[in-house]
């Protein structure tokens, strides 16, 4: 373990198991739709989580990426959101699952949900590996949550 890391919150095995459970949940929820889902990762933090999750989804599954920032130069959300890279895919009429690594203040995700809903997807849900409930400033309905975690700066997955 790195000298600057205080403790391990979740083991590799716990994370693998929970990602498999989330993938099974998504598979179950969309099993009757032949088009499956499009996973959208918020770069860069969620890219590894999304790739691991996609391997656990037993349906047609496309992946796309956005880069969105509300952190500026710090580690706390500034509330000012910028799209740095938009989607390559069209999402109109499609089932969208946004994959986040850490759901923190919810401000960035609120902006992202509003932006993507305007593109008329068939459905839109959110999955997050980690949710910091104590920091939430915006109410986000998260269909698939990996773990609740403390309101601390977190590193280590991906």
What are these model-predicted stretches?
Residues 1-158:
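PRPP-associated nucleotide enzymes
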